[in-house]
Design a protein with these regions (language model features):
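Low-complexity, acidic/Ser/Thr- and charged residue-rich accessory regions of DNA metabolism proteins
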Residues: 2-4, 24, 38, 252-257, ...
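Noncatalytic, basic helical substrate-engagement surface that gates or grips nucleic-acid strands
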Residues: 2-139, 154-169, 265, 271-272, ...
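Single, functionally critical "micro-switch" positions that shape active/binding sites
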Residues: 10, 145, 212
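Alpha-helical elements of the RecA-like P-loop NTPase motor core of helicases
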Residues: 124, 150-151, 218-219
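Long, highly charged, low-complexity intrinsically disordered interaction regions
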Residues: 129-130, 142-208
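Accessory alpha-helical DNA-binding modules that contact the DNA backbone or grooves
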Residues: 189-273
Length: 326
């Protein structure tokens, strides 16, 4: 029997990359070029996921954004200039589309939330949100191909809480299927060790010990939850199966290993931050109609809003409205 989820988390940038293409059709709106078709595809995709996997009456939807272009990955960029380098070279319309998705989402549905904060990535939000807001009997499905999100996979039988991850090609990762696929449990430190040693091409994180034997890795994660202790014990000969060759490799890679660990570690976010940054959304058809008319997309993906009265325009609607960027 398939699970009906009452909490759905969307990695917005991750999904956006899936619906856009290099030759995206663009429409001139004022002085901006807007990827209208991609915006429509984004909401068709997310609406389809909610309809297929979400509980009809009480599904809470969480839209988690990475940073805007002007501040993207600032904290981690200070550590490594190549961090997520492959994600920065995007045309202006890409970010115009993201901003428009945020604006539409704000008025698109009740019982939904936006998180978008400078210098905070989407995967930084997931664990604290689950820790602070997911309750007994809740079922969570996270939509992201980012392995960092797998650190939150959970099957708590005592509290009847399940957290699964939809990755790609209709694959839903569970704690069990992750372990079958990768050979280890998806705990926070285990995934951090995996990415620290073997790298992560999607985030431009360089491998440090790409040929480290799997049995050595499994022993490592069974004994250590922090890379600094692992490095110290390896260099002091306390990991007895490591020969001189491996100790030299670890010594030469130690600085990069510490850097990788910082890059893959979550930011420290507490409940006060979450409450302060949370943007509660609400369905407001009049607001949506103004946006849809400006973009000429009335009826494209949202059949609820009809073009009965064009009302104001997008610029006047936005007068006085600001989106906090902490």
């Amino acid at each position: 029997m398939s699970i009906i989820y009452n909490n759905i988390f969307f990695d917005v940038y991750n999904l956006w990359y899936r619906v856009v293409n290099k030759n995206e059709s663009l429409t001139d709106i004022g002085d901006k070029k807007v990827p209208i078709d991609a915006i429509c595809k984004f909401f068709e995709l997310t609406d389809g996921y909610i309809k297929k996997y979400g509980s009809v009456e009480n599904c809470r939807v969480w839209y988690l954004f990475d940073n805007a272009k002007t501040s993207m990955m600032k904290n981690r960029k200070l550590l490594d200039k190549d961090y997520k380098k492959n994600r920065e070279i995007q045309p202006d319309w890409f970010y115009v589309g993201i901003n428009m998705i945020e604006l539409i989402t704000k008025y698109y549905r009740d019982n939904s939330v936006i998180y978008r904060v400078q210098n905070v990535e989407a995967d930084d939000f997931v664990a604290p949100l689950i820790d602070n807001y997911i309750n007994e009997h809740d079922k969570v499905l996270m939509f992201s191909t980012d392995m960092d999100w797998s650190r939150c996979l959970l099957n708590d039988t005592e509290r009847d809480v399940v957290v699964n991850q939809y990755t790609r090609n209709n694959e839903i990762l569970t704690v069990k299927s992750f372990e079958e696929k990768f050979g280890f449990k998806p705990t926070y430190s285990n995934v951090c060790f995996w990415k620290t040693l073997y790298g992560d091409q999607s985030d431009c994180i360089l491998p440090t010990l790409s040929n480290y034997p799997k049995q050595y890795f499994l022993d490592c994660i069974s004994k250590y939850t922090d890379v600094s202790r692992f490095i110290s014990d390896a260099l002091n000969g306390k990991i007895t199966y490591l020969d001189a060759g491996w100790r030299i490799k670890i010594k030469n890679s130690a600085e990069r290993m510490m850097l990788n660990w910082q890059l893959v570690s979550n930011l420290d976010i507490d409940n006060f931050d979450l409450e302060n940054w949370k943007v509660e959304c609400a369905y407001k058809p009049n607001k949506l109609l103004i946006i849809y008319n400006t973009l000429n997309i009335v009826g494209r993906f949202d059949k609820r809003v009809k073009n009965e009265n064009k009302g104001s325009d997008l610029l006047s609607m936005l007068e006085g409205e600001t989106v906090e960027r902490v």
